[in-house]
UniProtKB/Swiss-Prot annotation:
Matching InterPro entries: BH2638-like_sf, UPF0223
Species of origin: Streptococcus equi subsp. equi (strain 4047)
Gene3D superfamilies for the chain: BH2638-like
Family under the similarity heading: Belongs to the UPF0223 family.
Domain of life per record: Bacteria
Protein known as: UPF0223 protein SEQ_1039
Length: 92
């Protein structure tokens, strides 16, 4: 995948909300590119869900992010929930 891609952000979000969403997406990137702490990813996901409340919007963002980056927010959260603690990597 390209190192340069656009994040699926909503222009109606505040700067603080964008920062929270970006933090979560960065945690997902870490899960694929290196290692990420399950607790930290789940914490950032909880903050993300305060902004992206609807399941349909969450799925849309996941689709757009996966199309642009090759990384699935769904798979990262699923793995973090499975292990709960410690570090994991989804790198190929």
């Amino acid at each position: 995948m390209s190192d340069h891609y656009h994040y699926p952000l909503d222009v109606s979000w505040s700067t603080e909300e964008i920062t929270s969403v970006l933090h979560f997406l960065n945690q997902v990137e870490l899960a694929y590119e290196a290692k990420v702490g399950a607790e930290e990813l789940l914490k950032s996901y909880a903050a993300y869900k305060e902004i992206v409340r609807s399941k349909s919007q969450e799925k849309q963002i996941d689709r757009e992010f996966q199309q642009a980056s090759g990384y699935s927010t769904y798979q990262a959260v699923k793995k973090a929930r499975e292990i709960e603690k410690g570090f994991f990597s989804l790198g190929r």
